[in-house]
Amino acid sequence: MSDTLGIALVGCGTVGGGVAHVLLAHADRITQRAGRALALRRVVVRDPNKPRDPLIAPELISTDIAGAIHDPAVHVVVELIGGLGVAKRVVLDALAAGKHVVTANKALLADAGAEVFEAARRAERTVCFEAAVAGGVPVIRALGESLAANQVTAIQAILNGTSNFILTAMAERGMSYAAALAEAQRLGYAEADPTLDVDGSDAAHKLAILAQISFGVTAKPHEIARQGIDTIDALDIRFANELGYTIKLLAEAWTGGHSHSTNGAKLSRGGAADATGTPTVALHVAPVLLRHTDLLAQVRGAYNAVLVYGDIVGETLYQGPGAGQMPTASSVVADLIDLGVGRAQRTFAAAKLWSREGRGFTVEPPERVRSRFYLRLQVTDKPGVLADITRILADEEISISSLVQHEAQEDGGGPVPLVIVTHYAATGRFRRALERINKLGTTAAPAVFFSMGD
């Protein structure tokens, strides 16, 4: 057996505590699978007096980040403090000191992946990040290794457990958005400020990472078209169910090379190429109406799932807990085992992530992405309103697939919900139509719309 692999853990909160526990409680198993001992040498924390797992020897705990990074007995630095400021400095300093890095920091990779990976290549060291996307679901390894013979043509994923918990509660228990969010916060699925979860930002960070691995595309999270779940009303849940659909917050990537059938026609949601002939990939995070029979429609609660389409293998699904102490720790320790075996070093060198050697894809402009749309309007109940709306849609070459309008109350006078499902249309044209509809003066509230997943 070769020398011990020394580990410094920077951050020992929920996930860091889980990593320390797994390394110490299952040391024999991990040694067997890594082919060498994985020894926890340092644990860096903000508050050394905070109670910790009794398996962590007190002498390992300190507040000295630099001491941990430059300790000659440390070969790997595990960054689990999150965010961009201190975490980025820790990662770059560790690489400069000749240490491998394991991180679960999606924001760091999505925003500064190019800088981090260039530093790793200069230092001839490895960055592992399985836990940065979908927690305990091994989708990074699947894309980088198991599907290496494929060109991924599309990804559809539920990457935020908080949003999926809220939508599940609304669909299955008839809860309002506000009530479902409050329950998610009470159970610890949502933060006191849930903005990053419910507005799609968290999922956009993760999609940016998946897009880099799958297509070689470097897309900043703010460059990804994004729509959150906070505009979804109980009315939308009911109408979707009536139409045979469930609403899910999806992170999606579509290439022009991916098509699917609907009503016997082959359709592509992403453009084939840009003006220079370079193939494009459409990236967006938004609520999507999925048929009840779709695989992702059946993912419940706080679980994550990633559906990957490869040009050789076809459709593969990866599902499991997307967050939490032990699921995330499982992925972090798996990266450490890969480093111990030497597998991670070989795959890192071959992958060339966040480098100039991309795979020839560019990001599709959001307005060119094609979709069917669900449109809900609160309209005044008087003659001519529907005719005005359909005329505007026709002006933008948007045809109607179906329409749902329940009878108005007997007293009349108040707005009534009108739901329109369109055929495929370009997002830019659809948004122009919405702007005109909202200016008609016959709607009681701004239009609500979502993409259809078929």
Question: Language-model segments: what does each one mean?
Answer:
Residues 62-63, 78-79, 102-104, 127-131, ...:
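General beta-strand structural signal in soluble alpha/beta enzymes
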Residues 100-102, 400:
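A short hydrophobic/small-residue beta-strand
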Residues 179-258, 277-298, 303-305:
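Substrate-binding/catalytic subdomain of NAD(P)-dependent oxidoreductase enzymes
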Residues 87-97, 106-144:
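Rossmann-fold NAD(P)-binding glycine/threonine-rich loop
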Residues 274, 331, 336-454:
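A conserved regulatory-domain signal marking ACT and ACT-like small-molecule sensing domains
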Residues 121-202, 209:
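Rossmann-like NAD(P)H-binding beta-loop-alpha module
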Residues 1-97:
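N-terminal glycine-/serine-/threonine-rich beta1-alpha1-beta2 phosphate-ribose binding loop
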Residues 292, 316, 320-326:
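Glycine-rich phosphate/pyrophosphate-binding beta-alpha loops
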